[in-house]
Amino acid sequence: LELMQAKESDFPDGRSIWQLGTPYWGEGPYVGMKSKFELLVLPTASDQVGFLGQQFGLSIRRTQRWHDLVRGSLIVVTNVSENELFEDQKIYGHVVFNTAINLLDGFKHYSYDTPCWLREGLGHFMEREINPRFNTFDASEGSVGVRVNKENWDDEVKQLIAAGKAPRVAELTGLKAYAEFEMRHHYACWSMTKFMIATNPQGYACMTAMLHGRKREDGTPDSENLLDVQRAAFTQCFGMSYPQFDEAWRAWAIAQ
């Protein structure tokens, strides 16, 4: 709530019906979700596959975030063995990474996906606040994704900037799936998220609000043209175009 600059009273009680033409804050009191956010940590991948198969018809061995449409809840299901979560802080960080993404997606109700770079950026930001030694990377189905365990990401970002290889925000907004992420994208989305939260938390909250809870005139969820919405949000919330943001971020990142 602090990052989103929202109050518990902003969200509906889960019983009232939203009226067309009024601000939409979701379907229930849990940042817009009807039911509480859930977490299940199991000992082994076999335990996880058994649970997911019985509950949701899934057979996934690695960490899974899932929207239970019946109960209106977002859940994180993980297991210690497959994800090598053998240290307390690694478990803690991994859980926080995934729960932070669920909270972001669930803000004003999970009716559509938040852009990938913002989800991954917030997940990295929250996890690395706990211990930068341990880092989680999302992957698309059927892919192992990126698995690099460097600790000092500030130096990695500086090297990318110096080499002219740092992604621009326009490139990050165009990423449609985690399979498209290279390591430089992970570094950049983390650093840009940290930059926004550190230098303009009001702007970050404003952008998040603009992207979530969008409705068409008939009241159905509106996930169209999120690329245009993001560009408009940078102008409205940060007072910068994409090139201006890139320049400000690079200057800040080099100083870290």
In which residue ranges do the predicted regions lie?
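Acidic/His/Gly-enriched intrinsically disordered linker/tail segments
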Residues: 61-78, 90, 110-256
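Juxtacatalytic substrate-recognition/specificity segment
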Residues: 1-115, 217-219, 225-232
